[in-house]
């Protein structure tokens, strides 16, 4: 075979080239070029077959991912030649120079150079002269406007993140609770704008120990205010469902707190005065002389702290209710029940305050912190009541004595200053807080029916024994009879005291 090829003047390689060229021409001329291979039919040109298979197998292998682009390299910091972190405020700069320039512009910093205002600024010396560093920032092209725009953008982002007021919605039950508490507060405590102010010139220039005229007026107004606080408490949802003992305990514990909160909301900072419920307006000196004494400056300071809170009547009423219905008071019979009654009040004040001030979420905790301040003032007030008893010529008004003083401490003071005709066992504390408006309990009604007379609001009912009603119909001693073996002595003592 090779001899024939040699006779034609063609070697094996030349024959393969001719055959290969013919096959290529055939494939290009065929409409089925993509799927036909003449060598596959004839079985010749095995080398070409292997080459075709190799090429097809390479096409099936997935190509490798392209390599990541090289990290972007910035020019060195234009200010100090340190490594740059990017373009900031218009020029390539490092993090240190970026922050320095931003702080200097935002805070309007004024620097001073202690040399010739031409200090060299580089990576090592940049912190030695702030004046020259800032000047170089300007020289290389850093922009003030870029800093301001960046600051405004941040402020806008913060505003966009604020939860809209619509998200602070009171449920139906809480809305009803807020309305009831607000109405109870407004109807028992008129606002400052509803009062006709009037003043007095009594001892308004200098402080004295006690102005008896102002004291008489102050004690009269305080008694009326205490009655209004009791009425406010009775109108709070759920308060009257507590035990009688717990109602009395809560009122005694919180009455001075609420009294101080109410009077401090009528503070006028321009004149440095406070206005009472009848419109009487006293300045700081007159408040001192009316009986506040060393408590005066503390009360006025607290009134000034309330001003930034800008509390409305609803918030004042809710805070008063929270202060009153508080389960951590001493001697409560059912503190857990009191706490459960307080929880919706706390939730209502939180939602109401945030809905009223959506951009000031800190106002609610600041309001609650005022309860602690009020308790501190109340403690000082109880101490002041003891010393005030020594200054006034007559007895302390009953309600003020009951509300503003520690009963045990008062008894100790009164025993040391007054001589009693004969000792007698102390009577239980009178339930005057719950009988302000002649509303007696069922026991009082039955007592009055059996004896034909009404009990004194300063006496507490005792259990009567058989026969006691008949011989005590003409004396106040009937309420005290039948309790101890020395009933006759007790009746005489109380009868004489009533006269």
UniProtKB/Swiss-Prot annotation:
Gene Ontology molecular-function annotations: DNA binding; nuclear receptor activity; RNA polymerase II cis-regulatory region sequence-specific DNA binding; zinc ion binding
Biological processes, Gene Ontology terms: cell differentiation; liver development; negative regulation of transcription by RNA polymerase II; pharyngeal system development; positive regulation of transcription by RNA polymerase II; retinoic acid receptor signaling pathway
Known DNA-binding region: 77-142
Biased amino acid composition, Acidic residues: 456-477
Region annotation Disordered: where it falls in the sequence: 51-70, 409-499
UniProt keyword list: DNA-binding, Metal-binding, Nucleus, Receptor, Transcription, Transcription regulation, Zinc, Zinc-finger
Compartments where located: Nucleus
Entry keyword Flavoprotein: no
Region (Modulating): 1-76
Any GO CC annotation of this UniProt entry: nucleus
Region ranges (Hinge): 143-172
Residues annotated as domain NR LBD: 173-407
Upregulation: By retinoic acid, in embryonic anterior brain and eye.
Zinc finger (NR C4-type): 77-97, 113-137
Subunit note: Heterodimer; with an rxr molecule. Binds DNA preferentially as a rar/rxr heterodimer.
Function: Receptor for retinoic acid. Retinoic acid receptors bind as heterodimers to their target response elements in response to their ligands, all-trans or 9-cis retinoic acid, and regulate gene expression in various biological processes. The rar/rxr heterodimers bind to the retinoic acid response elements (RARE) composed of tandem 5'-AGGTCA-3' sites known as DR1-DR5. Required for hindbrain development and for the development of pharyngeal arches.
Family: Belongs to the nuclear hormone receptor family. NR1 subfamily.
Domain remark text: Composed of three domains: a modulating N-terminal domain, a DNA-binding domain and a C-terminal ligand-binding domain.
UniProt name for this protein: Retinoic acid receptor gamma-A
Species assigned in the record: Danio rerio (Zebrafish)
GN (gene name): rarga
């Amino acid at each position: 075979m090779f001899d024939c090829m040699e006779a034609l003047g063609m070697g094996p390689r030349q024959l393969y080239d001719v055959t290969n060229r013919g096959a290529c021409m055939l494939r290009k001329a065929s409409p089925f070029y993509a799927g036909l291979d003449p060598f596959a039919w004839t079985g010749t040109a095995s080398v070409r077959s292997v080459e075709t298979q190799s090429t097809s197998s390479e096409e099936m292998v997935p190509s490798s991912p392209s390599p990541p682009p090289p990290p972007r390299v910035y020019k060195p910091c234009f200010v100090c030649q340190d490594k740059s972190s990017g373009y900031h405020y218009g020029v390539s700069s490092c993090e240190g120079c970026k922050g320095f320039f931003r702080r200097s512009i935002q805070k309007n910093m004024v620097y001073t150079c202690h040399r010739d205002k031409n200090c060299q600024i580089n990576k090592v010396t940049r912190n030695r002269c702030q004046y020259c560093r800032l000047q170089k920032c300007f020289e290389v092209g850093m922009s003030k406007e870029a800093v301001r725009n960046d600051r405004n953008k941040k402020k806008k982002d913060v505003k966009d993140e604020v939860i809209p007021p619509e998200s602070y919605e009171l449920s139906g039950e809480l809305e009803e609770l807020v309305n009831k508490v607000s109405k109870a507060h407004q109807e028992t405590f008129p606002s400052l704008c509803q009062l006709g102010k009037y003043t007095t010139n009594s001892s308004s220039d200098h402080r004295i120990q006690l102005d008896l005229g102002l004291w008489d007026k102050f004690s009269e107004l305080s008694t009326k205010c205490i009655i209004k606080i009791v009425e406010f408490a009775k109108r709070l949802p759920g308060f009257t469902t507590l035990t009688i003992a717990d109602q009395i305990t809560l009122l005694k514990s919180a009455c001075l707190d609420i009294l101080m909160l109410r009077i401090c909301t009528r503070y006028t900072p321009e004149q440095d005065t406070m206005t009472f419920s009848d419109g009487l307006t006293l300045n700081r000196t007159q408040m001192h002389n009316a009986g506040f004494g060393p408590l005066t400056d503390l009360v006025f300071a607290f009134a000034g702290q309330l001003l930034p809170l800008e509390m409305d009547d609803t918030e004042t009423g809710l805070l008063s209710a929270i202060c009153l219905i508080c389960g951590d008071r001493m001697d409560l019979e059912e503190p857990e029940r009191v706490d459960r009654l307080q929880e919706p009040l706390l939730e209502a004040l939180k939602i109401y305050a945030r809905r009223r001030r959506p951009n000031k979420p800190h106002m609610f905790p600041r309001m609650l912190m005022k309860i602690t301040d009020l308790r501190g003032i109340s403690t000082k007030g109880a101490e002041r009541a003891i010393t005030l008893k020594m200054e006034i010529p007559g007895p302390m008004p009953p309600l003020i004595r009951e509300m503003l003083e520690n009963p045990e401490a008062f008894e100790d003071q009164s025993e040391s200053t007054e001589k009693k005709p004969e000792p007698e066992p102390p009577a239980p504390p009178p339930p005057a807080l719950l009988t302000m408006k002649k509303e007696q309990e069922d026991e009082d009604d039955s007592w009055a029916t059996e004896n034909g007379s009404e009990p004194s609001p300063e006496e507490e009912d005792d259990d009567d024994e058989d026969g006691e009603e008949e011989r005590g119909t003409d004396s106040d001693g009937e309420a005290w009879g039948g309790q101890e073996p020395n009933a006759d002595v007790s009746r005489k003592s109380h009868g004489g005291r009533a006269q």
